[in-house]
From Swiss-Prot:
A motif (Q motif) lies at residues 40-68. It catalyses: ATP + H2O = ADP + phosphate + H(+). It comes from the Eukaryota. The lineage of its organism: Eukaryota, Viridiplantae, Streptophyta, Embryophyta, Tracheophyta. Pfam families: DEAD (PF00270), Helicase_C (PF00271). It comes from Nicotiana plumbaginifolia (Leadwort-leaved tobacco). This is Eukaryotic initiation factor 4A-2. ATP binds at A84, Q85, S86, G87, T88, G89, K90, T91. SMART domains: DEXDc, HELICc. Keywords: ATP-binding, Helicase, Hydrolase, Initiation factor, Nucleotide-binding, Protein biosynthesis, RNA-binding. Its EC number is 3.6.4.13.
Length: 413
């Protein structure tokens, strides 16, 4: 059993390798097996024809590093631990594994996917539905902030897959609206984030209600001790798929910084950028909800059309704003880290960090929004004297060099 950590403590990715080495160097080294087979194309993976149609229709051409390694073992029914960040195509990895194994003639819940936020759960639901379009999959997202009665009605009518947040999923199981008898796959997405948000007990409670023989997939950017503990309690001889941090991170995304003497001058720099660049769609990250509102007002007063979203807005408003952004009717979205993980817009070509993130891990969650799945993307970081330390930490953490923004930036977009 991995040592459990103090409640509410946070761990970063740098501890992952050390922790794994320590665990694998002990008598428990039989616990994990590494899975090293790599498939260069989706066609080579032995997937159903109609699943392949969904994958290609969604816009995938070549599998990403995590997909090349991760789809097949999941399809084989193995318990899988994948260390993978946002922007690497991991959602499509486990969605493909789930869709390949469903019995479509049985309209009962056969797969349960848990995610830490409503936005992420809804995003997974969209990907699952899109990839399973030609298979006739029935998917439902059970998340807080929506009608309990509506959830009960849909679950009663029958679905193949439920995606949701731990609180609402546990509620549906407790009310017996979600029947666990046929569930054969259980996926924890962003396990580190769920644990840091205090969902550990609920995840354990849900697991107790599931059938004993069940396939488990754990996806996590980092592996804090609590996540390792979960893998030990829930999993049976899991295969461990690790894509090295520098291999999966920022491939295909050009990163730059702009030196700004004072915090107050960031706004001028930002407006200059928007006046010189032809941008399809972009996301601007700031660190506080208050700053989202402030920056939105400032940009609108200068005739820039922008949308804004943050955690203080109700779910319905956030959904409408995200729909507008996805459809392209709004081209600039200002937001905070909280929602970084739920944004998946294929056309985003530019991410601007108006504020650098407070944790190096979040840098990837943010800039992974541009250059999704091998597309070209650009990230621009606005840096004052106070930000220099964090910029240095980010470069060290991801083993990258972030260069000063060149004069010909327009040619890069």
């Amino acid at each position: 059993m991995a040592g459990s950590a103090p409640e509410g403590s946070q761990f970063d990715a740098r501890q992952f390798d050390a922790k794994m080495t320590e665990l694998l160097g002990t008598e428990q080294e039989e616990f994990f097996t590494s899975y090293d087979e790599v498939y260069d194309s989706f066609d080579a993976m032995g997937l159903q024809e109609n699943l392949l149609r969904g994958i290609y229709a969604y816009g995938f051409e070549k599998p990403s590093a995590i997909q090349q390694r991760g789809i097949v073992p999941f399809c084989k029914g193995l318990d899988v631990i994948q260390q993978a960040q946002s922007g690497t195509g991991k959602t499509a990895t486990f969605c493909s594994g789930v869709l390949q194994q469903l019995d479509y003639s049985l309209v009962e819940c056969q797969a349960l996917v848990l995610a830490p936020t409503r936005e992420l759960a809804q995003q997974i639901e969209k990907v699952m539905r899109a990839l399973g379009d030609y298979l006739g999959v029935k998917v439902h997202a059970c998340v807080g902030g929506t009608s309990v009665r509506e959830d009960q009605r849909i679950l009663q009518s029958g679905v193949h897959v439920v995606v949701g947040t731990p609180g609402r999923v546990f509620d549906m199981l407790r009310r017996q609206s979600l029947r666990p008898d046929h569930i054969k796959m259980f996926v924890l997405d962003e396990a580190d984030e769920m644990l840091s948000r205090g969902f550990k007990d609920q995840i354990y409670d849900i697991f107790q209600l599931l059938p004993p023989k069940i396939q488990v997939g754990v996806f996590s950017a980092t592996m804090p001790p609590e996540a390792l503990e979960i893998t030990r309690k829930f999993m049976n001889k899991p295969v461990r798929i690790l894509v090295k941090r520098d291999e999966l991170t920022l491939e295909g995304i050009k990163q730059f910084y702009v030196n700004v003497d004072k915090e107050e001058w960031k706004l001028e720099t930002l407006c200059d950028l928007y006046e010189t660049l032809a941008i399809t769609q972009s996301v601007i990250f700031v660190n506080t909800r208050r700053k989202v509102d402030w920056l939105t007002d400032k940009m609108r007063s200068r005739d820039h059309t922008v949308s804004a979203t943050h955690g203080d807005m109700d779910q319905n408003t956030r959904d409408i704003i995200m729909r507008e952004f996805r459809s392209g009717s709004s081209r600039v979205l200002i937001t905070t880290d909280l929602l970084a993980r739920g944004i998946d817009v294929q056309q985003v070509s530019l991410v601007i960090n108006y504020d650098l993130p407070t944790q190096p891990e979040n840098y990837l969650h943010r800039i992974g929004r541009s250059g999704r799945f091998g597309r070209k993307g650009v990230a621009i970081n606005s840096v004052t004297k106070d930000d220099e330390r964090m910029l240095f930490d980010i470069q060290k953490f991801y083993n990258v060099v972030i260069e000063e923004l060149p004069a010909n930036v327009a040619d890069l977009l």
